[in-house]
Curated annotation (Swiss-Prot):
Pfam families, alphabetized: Exo_endo_phos (PF03372)
Coiled coil spans: none
Cytoplasm as UniProt keyword: yes
Molecular function terms from GO: catalytic activity
Name of the protein described by the UniProt record: UPF0294 protein YafD
Keywords of the record: Cytoplasm
Compartments reported by the entry: Cytoplasm
GO cellular component, one term: cytoplasm
Annotated source species: Shigella dysenteriae serotype 1 (strain Sd197)
Coarse class of the protein's main subcellular location: cytoplasm
Lineage: Bacteria, Pseudomonadati, Pseudomonadota, Gammaproteobacteria, Enterobacterales
Keyword RNA-binding: no
Family, per entry: Belongs to the UPF0294 family.
Amino acid sequence: MRKNTYAMRYVAGQPAERILPPGSFASIGQALPPGEPLSTEERIRILVWNIYKQQRAEWLSVLKNYGKDAHLVLLQEAQTTPELVQFATANYLAADQVPAFVLPQHPSGVMTLSAAHPVYCCPLREREPILRLAKSALVTVYPLPDTRLLMVINIHAVNFSLGVDVYSKQLLPIGDQIAHHSGPVIMAGDFNAWSRRRMNALYRFAREMSLRQVRFTDDQRRRAFGRPLDFVFYRGLNVSEASVLVTRASDHNPLLVEFSPGKPDK
């Protein structure tokens, strides 16, 4: 699906910019010179949320209350409505969306809001085999204060498929990206891991990529068939805090995680 795969970048005061997939992995960290770091603090706060195409009331108040203090906001099913774009450009230096498919008015897909400009951006898409609709993912890279580069993967996994072949296929190019990156990684989003086979495929992928799963003490994540759908995986970082915000502003509850960029725990 590379032909129709691209990201749209929204920056305050500038026209939206279309970004095509990079030609090679060699461009990771070389596409742009590192600018301001993602965080000047000793912590990185992220919010991960399937925002349900902003179909419910209060989604904006949730973002304003919990997203504005985050260095990264990873949204799934984000529609580029004027309200969302205005919030993103007013509170973040960059907002990158990968349109999975175009709805009557606004494209919908994963969207990453960041407190720093990414030095690398790779949009990805995979088509649902049954509904023929696409799901998207986005790989971005940001400089950290310690000169390392943080890779961030925002993913909305395919939902309706027989078996796990297409599910695993969507993870393959993400694995290629991680394999060519030596720094810390955060991979998060709606993984639609509602079956045992999907969970096993996801956990196997995480192990192969040396990614650890963020654990939530009061685990109020959205579930299907008793299994959580939303996850945060990481490497090269420490988890300081992790919580789930219970809200009716979407059919998913946002995940709030704070990382410290020091050396990870053994």
